C-alpha cells in the first residue's frame, strides 16, 4: 500500500520527532488497518520514544491491531513493555505475547519467574518461557507447580523441568521419578 511505502521511505530519516508526529496522527486514522501499519512500523523501527503509544494499542478491541502492538512492544523492549506483555499471558492474545516475550531483548527473567505466581493460564505460559530461558533460579517454583490442581499447569511444569533443573536438583528429580505417574515419566526423563 501507499501508506506502507511512505513509512518505508521515511525510515531513512526517522527520529524521535518523526515518530512523535506520526504517533500524534494515530487517533485520527480512520481504520484499524492503517493503525496496525503504523504500530508495526514503530515496532520495526524500535521507536522507544513511542513505547507508550504502542503499549496502549495492545488494549485495542481490533485483534490484528492488538497483536501488532504486542509484536511491536516486544521489539521495542523496556520494563513497561515487559510488564504489558507479561500481563497478556492470561489474555486472548497469550500466544502472541509468549512469542514476543520469547524473543524479548532485555532482562525478563525476574518478570517470567514472577508470572509463575499468576493465574493458571499465566503460569502455563510462563513455565514455557522460564524453561526456554533456562532460568534455574525458578526451579523451586517449577517444582511446586508440579502439584498444581490445574492439569495444564502440571503438564507445563513437568515440561519445564528440563530447562530449569540443575545438578543440585538431582535428589528431587529422583524422588519425582519414583513417585511419577506413567504420563509424567517421559517429561522427567527429558
Give names to the regions the model predicted:
Residues 11, 40-43, 74, 102, ...:
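Structural signature of alpha-helical solenoid repeat scaffolds
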Residues 150, 154-165:
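Repeat-solenoid scaffold signature
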Residues 3, 19, 35, 66, ...:
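Residue-level detector of extended alpha-helical repeat arrays and alpha-solenoid scaffolds
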Residues 1-4, 15-28, 35-36, 47-59, ...:
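Amphipathic alpha-helical scaffolding segments comprising HEAT/armadillo-like alpha-solenoid repeats
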Amino acid at each position: 500500500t501507499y501508506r506502507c511505502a511512505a513509512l518505508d521511505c521515511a525510515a531513512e530519516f526517522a527520529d524521535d520527532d518523526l515518530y512523535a508526529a506520526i504517533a500524534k496522527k494515530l487517533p485520527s486514522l480512520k481504520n484499524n488497518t492503517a493503525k496496525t501499519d503504523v504500530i508495526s512500523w514503530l515496532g520495526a523501527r524500535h521507536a522507544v520514544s513511542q513505547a507508550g503509544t504502542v503499549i496502549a494499542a495492545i488494549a485495542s478491541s481490533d485483534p490484528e491491531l492488538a497483536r501488532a502492538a504486542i509484536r511491536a512492544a516486544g521489539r521495542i523492549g523496556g520494563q513497561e513493555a515487559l510488564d504489558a506483555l507479561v500481563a497478556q499471558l492470561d489474555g486472548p492474545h497469550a500466544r502472541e505475547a509468549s512469542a514476543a516475550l520469547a524473543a524479548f531483548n532485555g532482562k525478563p527473567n525476574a518478570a517470567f519467574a514472577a508470572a509463575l505466581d499468576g493465574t493458571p493460564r499465566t503460569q502455563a505460559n510462563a513455565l514455557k518461557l522460564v524453561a526456554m530461558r533456562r532460568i534455574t533460579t525458578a526451579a523451586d517454583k517449577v517444582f511446586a507447580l508440579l502439584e498444581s490442581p490445574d492439569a495444564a499447569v502440571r503438564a507445563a511444569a513437568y515440561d519445564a523441568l528440563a530447562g530449569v533443573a540443575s545438578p543440585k536438583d538431582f535428589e528431587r528429580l529422583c524422588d519425582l521419578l519414583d513417585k511419577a505417574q506413567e504420563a509424567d515419566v517421559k517429561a522427567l526423563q527429558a
